[in-house]
Amino acid sequence: MKVHEANQGLTLPGSVVAIGAFDGVHQGHQAVLRQAVERSRQLGVESVAYTIDPPPRCRFQGSRMLTTLQEKLDRFAVLGLNHAVVAHFDERYAARRVDAFIRELTALNPREVIVGQDFRFGRNREGDVALLRRHFPVRIVQTVCCADGQRISSTRIRELIERGEWEQSTVLLGWPLSS
């Protein structure tokens, strides 16, 4: 897997792009990423994970990161992605307008963009799936729930870890968490 900085101007002749913070690369994230790999193979193009580091919740709300950037990239490679684009999330990136993000994605020539149901982007989370669909074909991966019916999320996994429920957090992640 090739790793690129978001500001390097990567261009591809065609791709399927999965977008997200992917903190923890939990089972919900894995569903999004696997869908990107599967669709890219079906369409004969490269698969791309576009991620931000650190995750916004960690940067601005002080939440614990579940995975380092390297751990995240290692998981992407295991899942079979061809490329990872890493945007370094800071105040400047957070202030980006939605059109700047759309322009950046356009260079990847996405045949499809794959996101989770709650995907938002741009300054103040102004961009949504409807806006993304005006520019690209978008596929939304349904929320992944655990056996008790609750949504799998990085926030929920953090809460389990804080309570010392390591076994349950590992189940939701789908792989062992580094300490």
Swiss-Prot record:
Reactions it catalyzes: riboflavin + ATP = FMN + ADP + H(+); FMN + ATP + H(+) = FAD + diphosphate
InterPro entries assigned to the protein according to its UniProt record, in alphabetical order: FAD_synthase (IPR015864), Riboflavin_kinase (IPR023468), Rossmann-like_a/b/a_fold (IPR014729)
Gene3D superfamilies from the UniProt entry: HUPs
Alphabetized Pfam families for the sequence: FAD_syn (PF06574)
BP terms from Gene Ontology: FAD biosynthetic process; FMN biosynthetic process; riboflavin biosynthetic process
E.C. numbers: 2.7.1.26, 2.7.7.2
Keywords: ATP-binding, FAD, Flavoprotein, FMN, Kinase, Multifunctional enzyme, Nucleotide-binding, Nucleotidyltransferase, Transferase
Pathway connected to this protein: Cofactor biosynthesis; FAD biosynthesis; FAD from FMN: step 1/1; Cofactor biosynthesis; FMN biosynthesis; FMN from riboflavin (ATP route): step 1/1
Molecular function terms from GO: ATP binding; FMN adenylyltransferase activity; riboflavin kinase activity
Domain of life from the UniProt record: Bacteria
Functional note: Catalyzes the phosphorylation of riboflavin to FMN followed by the adenylation of FMN to FAD.
Family in the record: Belongs to the RibF family.
PANTHER family named among the record's database cross-references: RIBOFLAVIN KINASE, RIBOFLAVIN KINASE/FMN ADENYLYLTRANSFERASE
Record protein name field: Putative bifunctional riboflavin kinase/FMN adenylyltransferase
Native source species: Geobacillus thermodenitrificans (strain NG80-2)
